[in-house]
């Protein structure tokens, strides 16, 4: 059985575990860097990116997370997790993991009072997907190797590059598990190809 980890430092960790399990994989909360060896794929959940970065540094996760992504194992960043994955963050020179070739803008849809839901067309999913946006970032620019999966009002809100997946919204906060399933399928494919 596939095991997908959720970085358990902050954010909607339980909700991601529930969604992973609904897709038929095992979910594991990752609290320590050495636990990354036990998983086939990793979700970086939403939360607050500055706080998450501080916790990543405190618990010495930065290098192990970069090595995990460099190994080719799939990583999915949602909301703040997208910011953590991004190569560039608008208005600052301080990227985090810097592995997904995008430039993101934080809180680009407004403050928490401006949180909203929107029906999205997501490449690879049949029918609309309800995106829950909470102080969400969006992708300002995507590199040549980045596939745009979804836009909302002309703003990129989901993208994929190799085994990296990122979205501005919180797919774990709905009962529609198709975004998580998309990631589970990426992990399955990677694990299959790694064995060959």
Swiss-Prot record:
Stretches assigned to coiled coil: none
PROSITE patterns: PDXT_SNO_1, PDXT_SNO_2
Domain of life, source organism: Bacteria
Key word Cytoplasm present: no
Keyword Hydrolase: yes
Catalyzed chemical reaction(s): aldehydo-D-ribose 5-phosphate + D-glyceraldehyde 3-phosphate + L-glutamine = pyridoxal 5'-phosphate + L-glutamate + phosphate + 3 H2O + H(+); L-glutamine + H2O = L-glutamate + NH4(+)
Protein keywords: Glutamine amidotransferase, Hydrolase, Lyase, Pyridoxal phosphate
Active site residues per record: 79, 170, 172
Gene Ontology CC: cytosol; glutaminase complex
Full protein name: Pyridoxal 5'-phosphate synthase subunit PdxT
